[in-house]
C-alpha cells in the first residue's frame, strides 16, 4: 500500500528525497501472491533494477488452457504469463509464508513451507496441509500482493444493507446486480 501511494504521488508530480523512496534497485525482491497485483509488483521491481525477483503463491500451479474445475461463469483458474513475468522472475507454487526474518529492523528473508492441497470428498474447497518442508527465501524487499477469500462481515446496524463486492467480495457484475435486488427487497421489508 505504501509503495503504491508513493508511486501515485510521484506520478502526480510530488517529489521525495532519494533516501525516502521505496525502490527495488539492487534488491532481492520477494512477491507474495500470484495475481494481477503480484504481476504489477514484478514488472515494477524488474524495471527499477532489482537483483532478483521471486514470486510465490500458496495455491497450486493452475493448468494451461481450459480448466474444467472452473467453468463459466466462474473466473477461469488457468496458468497465465503476463508481460511482467516475461521481464524476468522466478515463480513458485504451493508455498506458504510462515515468518519474516530480519536483522537490525530490516527484512533479510521469509521462511516458507511447502503445502499440499487435499481435494474435498464432496467436491468443495480443498484443504491445505503443511508438509513440514521449510526453507528460507532471501529477500531484502517483500511485497504483499495477496488476495482474500471473502470480505469480513462486520456487525452493522439493522438499517445498513450491503450489495455487490462489499457483500461477497470481487465477483461478477450479474451477482452484484442480484445482490442489489436482494438488498432493495430487504430495505423495502425494513
PLM regions: where:
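Residues forming the flavin
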Residues: 3-190
